[in-house]
Amino acid sequence: MLHTLIIGAGPFGLTLSAHLKKQEVSHVVVGKPMEFWEKNMPEGMFLRSGCDWHLDVAGEHTMEAFLQERGLTVAEVEPIALDFYLEYVRWFMQQTALPIHQAYVTDLQQKEDYFLVKLNDGSVLEAQHVVV
């Protein structure tokens, strides 16, 4: 049984996953990473956040680290374009190897002391905690 199931693979779900992984808490993220952002954000969009905002609460796989690896400066990328941000998120996921199950939740039931989660790929997961 998982300690935590995270429903949603957007920025907050990925950030929480990285934090739980660092703390060695058993968990999985259910969803398709950044799918909503890729399919629904306007083409050519820029983020309001700057490079000091990133996914890694541990401060290891930051936007600054991503820029440094590519030989770029903050001034060259701010304001941050959506496509560049999505590239950072893909890099972040590669660096952290997060436990992501690319499926959708079809049923969520609270049992006496755990949650039973059914996914559209036929998988069934049990978790003590669920974060949506």
Describe the function of each predicted region.
Residues 2, 24, 96, 127-128:
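Short, well-ordered alpha-helix to beta-strand connector turns
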Residues 2-29:
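N-terminal Rossmann-like FAD-binding beta1-loop-alpha1 element of flavoenzymes
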Residues 5-7, 105, 124-132:
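Short hydrophobic core segments
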Residues 23, 99-103, 132:
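Long, mid-chain structured domain cores
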Residues 30-83:
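Glycine-rich active-site loop/strand segments that organize a redox cofactor
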Residues 82-100, 125:
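Helical element adjacent to the flavin cofactor pocket in flavoenzyme catalytic cores
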Residues 101-115:
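A conserved short coil-to-beta-strand element within the FAD-binding core of flavoproteins
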Residues 120-122:
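Glycine-centered tight beta-turn/hairpin loop motif at sheet-sheet or coil-to-beta transitions
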